């Protein structure tokens, strides 16, 4: 009799577990269908690499790009659906999260053709490179939809581990090894700081890990204004700051930009900021709802330091990649203005709009740098002197992207900054907006210095790198040029027709 009862209990427990697994797979699993497409693409890459020879290399690029495009398509089909929480509260799907996932997928889709010729010329391992890019993309997408502290920690670790491996991909290069070591050590330290902040938040809320439940727990325990929350806020801000790389958490950025392969830098420069921005908006806006004044002050300090230090130090740089590293530090200061403004006054909409333009401007600039580096073997700014005389198309493309980064009208960067600063002004962030305007003028100065060098380099200034430059054909099947053309067009034309982009961004608000 006892055995019969135990057997019935075992059958009931097994059935319950099976039904729960079935529900997770077929119901909750449908909410992560775009991520599942990328996972399937990863499996296909491994299968083809293990069963084929070097002749099937184009298939690897095709599968990677196709899986990313299919994931974007699946994401667009899910647009405007009702917000849903799945996997026992670990993951949330809504328009706000999905627009950031779309931006990450867009970055990866543009970065793969940008990397093709570079990988072939440097004889890097192709399969592993594509695997790391897709895995980092999956980690970034899960981070955008993360709804609890555990997922918010695990997802960026997935992204970070792939980032460390990508930054050290050219292992024979001493600079790459140095960059990887700094990136790894500082990344590990920032992760431990972030977890420590989560532990304070977990304890203060009475043991809650879901973001909304943390708010309810803080209300129930009357701890929403306690010193523990302030400590948690400081540690979490420092941890997230490493991913965003604002000053003073920027020390790793110039070395990693200079030492890593240029396509990797292009990938990391946009995807890490998009994923970290998505995470920061949710963490600051939900668990720290009652501490808005405190985190506003912290982010204002970070934004001011980033805009001033990033743009001032960029003036002194002689390497194009280091200059863009400090420029990106200044750019994230502008993005932080949108995070501070928040849901009110279209702060998030302006941040998303500027992020979209920043992706096209930054990737377009890096595409030009990759192309120039492959044809000349140099990354020094002075070696760009007189490039217009050898390759007008490349010189004009680089000039347009740099001018758009600086925010000159009528390019997309100008309208993105204008919308962002207008929202900040409407929210009363007058000092931040003034600092942003002044530092934008500074950035225009060092961008124009490079453009002047491109266009008017005198014969005595032209280095052997440009004298021996191989002129590109007018019609080229080069995948880097394809990415460059797409990014240059996206950096110029969308600024003229801003209303549809702003309307889509406004639809993503909570």
From Swiss-Prot:
Quaternary structure annotation from Swiss-Prot or TrEMBL: NDH is composed of at least 16 different subunits, 5 of which are encoded in the nucleus.
Key words of the record: Chloroplast, Membrane, NAD, NADP, Plastid, Plastoquinone, Quinone, Thylakoid, Translocase, Transmembrane, Transmembrane helix, Transport
Primary residence: plastid
Catalytic EC class: translocase
Transmembrane helix is among the record's keywords: yes
Residues passing through the membrane, by range: 24-44, 57-77, 99-119, 124-144, 149-169, 183-203, 227-247, 295-315, 323-343, 354-374, 395-415, 418-438, 484-504
Family per similarity comment: Belongs to the complex I subunit 2 family.
Organism: Guizotia abyssinica
CC annotations in GO: chloroplast thylakoid membrane
EC code(s) of this entry: 7.1.1.-
Entry's Gene Ontology molecular function annotations: NADH dehydrogenase (ubiquinone) activity; quinone binding
Pfam families: Ndh2_N, Proton_antipo_M
Biological process terms in GO annotation: ATP synthesis coupled electron transport; photosynthesis, light reaction
Record's subcellular location: Plastid, Chloroplast thylakoid membrane
Name assigned to this protein: NAD(P)H-quinone oxidoreductase subunit 2 A, chloroplastic
